Amino acid sequence: MCIRTAKNVDVSAILEVAHATPWEKDEYLRRQIGLGHVEILCEGDSVVAFIAWNAEFFSKPFVWLVVVRPDRREQGIAGRLFAAVEARCAGLRLYSSTNRSNVAMHRLFVRRGYRRAGELELDPGDSEAFYCIDL
């Protein structure tokens, strides 16, 4: 397995992984790939997972999407992708968020040393919890 920055040639494979979950942001993701803000985890020629981030959150780095193929979840892959983004953001404060209902992501944030930064009621009944870490 390897983790590397996604390139435009990876778009189709990344969108295939993305569409394993409800998805409607293809163009935004394409733009982030072009800017070098998407890291992918590959096995051979196959994209297993990706993480997308940018500095559009109050000019701070923010991980806005992590997707792991359903058959590869709960194997530490998301943590490896977070480590790759954290390395790129060394010396900064990195933010991310997840819905209250996403227990696996809350556990990942705690394991990686993130602290709770706040909460917004974006989805009725399933608020968004924000986390951050100083790198």
Where are these regions (language model features)?
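Conserved active-site alpha-helix within GNAT-family acetyltransferase domains
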Residues: G79, R100-E119, D126
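Short hydrophobic/aromatic beta-strand or adjacent loop that forms the aromatic wall/cage
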Residues: G36, D126-Y131
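A short, internal acetyl-CoA/4′-phosphopantetheine-binding micro-motif in the GNAT/acyltransferase core
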Residues: L65-R73, T98-R100
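Conserved acetyl-CoA-binding loop-helix of GNAT-fold acetyltransferases
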Residues: V68, E74-A87, R107, R111
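Conserved N-terminal entry element of GNAT/NAT acetyltransferase domains
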Residues: M1-V9, I133-L135
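Conserved GNAT acetyl-CoA-binding A-motif
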Residues: R88-R100
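Acetyl-CoA-dependent GNAT
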Residues: T5-W64, R69, F82, L122
